[in-house]
């Protein structure tokens, strides 16, 4: 079976008319806690989900369509294999029936699915996540950026809100989505607004750097709140928001939130939310380090872990062609101009170039330098106001500006369509940030190009970079190999190289002593 296409507007097929007709009243009559496995022709209950004390179980309704149930198991297995999908489920048989077509979505008595018309088929992370999330299971998704994670958690979120009765929705919000940056929060809001407006579900977006009064008004009638940790904590502290009614919690970009030091903030926020017995928790992350595993263990109950690809090491999207040029620092400006002139094509919408710098001052200098050479360019970095940053992003997305100079503030989560080239003027501080930077291109099944200007100052990261290139089947230049392919062991800030990371989620082995 060929690999399923990703969501793109280039390979559009209209939704089947059968899906559009799904507006039957009371069509969600199904048994809670259902996951579909091998040889399943009907629903089966998930162990642990029908606990009488688990109030969320009675709210979770999912039954696969007859068409999905009728698919041969060999077809399902081939889909999982061809898309490198791995499932780890502590409660049940890990096999399942992914929703590989929009026509396999569970019936709905409203217009929730209509905005899907512009897409051809679910992405792999959506196909596998939806049946689990619809069934009320806690879920951890590990997938590359640009894989369609927003709808993977967003569609079940809205469907869950619609399933709740009036008494359960009276305490708002019913669903909370936490994300590390305001740009990503706004992006999630924009994507979900198309679906929520079709079914009259109120959503709000709260983040720092914007007036609080307006956001306070927005969240009063919002069933779904999308928030950054800092502003959410502020609103909790002044009792603007009450999270005691949250039944659906999403932690998006969990690894990035840990990188930015938000772990304690998240711990504090979750204290005001119902326990795992009464809520469903979804986590998405691009990487799966020990810290994220420990966070997942403390916030979820018997979660299913879905991994797209190999999460053991950080890996770059193989659809992105990576080129590394080793040069002297003083050669960067002239080489930058050569590359821009080669790949810039009249500012067309499909020729956007994203230029990354490490520091704010450098980004401002590079932006001025590029602008002085006649290019239309905008910038985004930490010294800019919220309004200025959004203005730059919107200009870049719309195509009125085809060059954007950014620091790593824009490197994660932002879905900017049709970025032709990512150009790293300076190498980031970590190999993870490198992978996240270049992930701005090659999104949603498209091909991409990333060019990195590498100097001797960056040689400490030559080993990890070489590993990423090789893992993605990319050419490794000899000039890079001369710096060495050794990967240095990460050091703890207090204990140095003697520190050993431990996976605290593992159960200790039982030792039996003879009498």
UniProtKB/Swiss-Prot annotation:
CDD domains: DEADc, SF2_C_DEAD. A motif (Q motif) lies at residues 100-127. Residues 335-484 form the Helicase C-terminal domain. The keyword Chloroplast does not apply. Keywords: ATP-binding, Helicase, Hydrolase, Nucleotide-binding, Nucleus, Ribosome biogenesis, RNA-binding, rRNA processing. ATP binds at residues 143-150. GO terms for molecular function: ATP binding; ATP hydrolysis activity; RNA binding; RNA helicase activity. The keyword Glycosyltransferase does not apply. Residues 1-67 are annotated as: Disordered. It is found in: Nucleus, Nucleolus. It catalyses: ATP + H2O = ADP + phosphate + H(+). One of its GO terms (cellular component) is nucleolus. A motif (DEAD box) lies at residues 252-255. Its EC number is 3.6.4.13. SMART domains: DEXDc (SM00487), HELICc (SM00490). It is an enzyme of class 3 (hydrolase). One of its GO terms (biological process) is rRNA processing. Residues 130-306 form the Helicase ATP-binding domain. InterPro entries: DEAD/DEAH_box_helicase_dom, Helicase_ATP-bd, Helicase_C-like, P-loop_NTPase, RNA-helicase_DEAD-box_CS. ATP-dependent RNA helicase required for 60S ribosomal subunit synthesis. Involved in efficient pre-rRNA processing, predominantly at site A3, which is necessary for the normal formation of 25S and 5.8S rRNAs. The Q motif is unique to and characteristic of the DEAD box family of RNA helicases and controls ATP binding and hydrolysis. Belongs to the DEAD box helicase family. DDX5/DBP2 subfamily. This is ATP-dependent RNA helicase DBP3.
